[in-house]
């Protein structure tokens, strides 16, 4: 199938699993972002399944327990890894963006949040934000139900830490609640997108050549030739 690739603002969406995926829960977030001419990336559900299985084995590492549980979850994860490899290969072979394997995802939050933080989406949410930033999706909407304490810790609470590590990260947490107006939610997202669009256009406008440089003078440091 012919594909026309044009520069677009790339936006990743993370958050509490229901609000993240459900158009009813997030006021048609994907449709809204696409209406703003964005390329939208929702990390897949496979990672959450692997995360749940991984946590069972991690509990044995942190707190002890039956070795059979650890062995069983490791075997299950190995099977999931084989399924994941086939999925990622199908995506990349077709020319689509594919995330890294789960084994790499587990390493990303280390030094930022403990793998023992597994309330709700836990460390997975933080890891997904880091992976999105590293993959070029530095504009991120963190969708959460109003008053969701786990999300305030592993999502909203990690934003400053991620920004310290990746200054280009443009993350906005959005609370979804029946009492929250859709207009306010969309206006906050539009503010984030305004920053993203400025950055998208910046390389075109940056470092124009002077008349002297065009004649043959030496370009200044940082100038585009």
Task: Report each predicted region and the residues it spans.
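An N-terminal assembly and electron-transfer interface module characteristic of large anaerobic redox
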Residues: 1-225
């Amino acid at each position: 199938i012919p594909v026309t690739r044009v520069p677009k603002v790339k936006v990743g969406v993370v958050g509490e699993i229901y609000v993240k995926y459900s158009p009813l829960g997030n006021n048609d977030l994907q449709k809204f972002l696409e209406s703003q001419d964005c390329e939208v990336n929702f990390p897949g559900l496979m990672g959450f399944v692997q995360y749940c299985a991984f946590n069972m084995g991690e509990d044995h590492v942190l707190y002890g327990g039956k070795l059979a549980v650890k062995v069983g979850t490791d075997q299950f994860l190995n099977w999931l890894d084989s399924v994941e490899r086939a999925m990622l290969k199908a995506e990349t072979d077709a020319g689509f963006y594919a995330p890294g394997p789960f084994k790499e995802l587990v390493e990303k939050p280390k030094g930022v949040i403990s793998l023992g933080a597994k309330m709700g989406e836990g460390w997975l949410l933080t890891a997904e934000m880091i992976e999105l930033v590293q993959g070029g999706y530095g504009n991120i909407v963190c969708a959460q139900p109003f008053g969701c304490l786990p999300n305030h810790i592993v999502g909203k609470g990690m934003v400053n830490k991620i920004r310290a590590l990746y200054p280009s990260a443009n993350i906005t947490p959005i609370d979804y609640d029946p009492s929250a107006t859709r207009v306010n939610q969309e206006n906050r997202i539009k503010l984030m997108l305004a920053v993203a669009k400025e950055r998208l256009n910046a390389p075109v406008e940056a470092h124009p050549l002077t008349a002297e440089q065009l004649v043959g003078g030496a370009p200044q440091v940082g100038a585009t030739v």
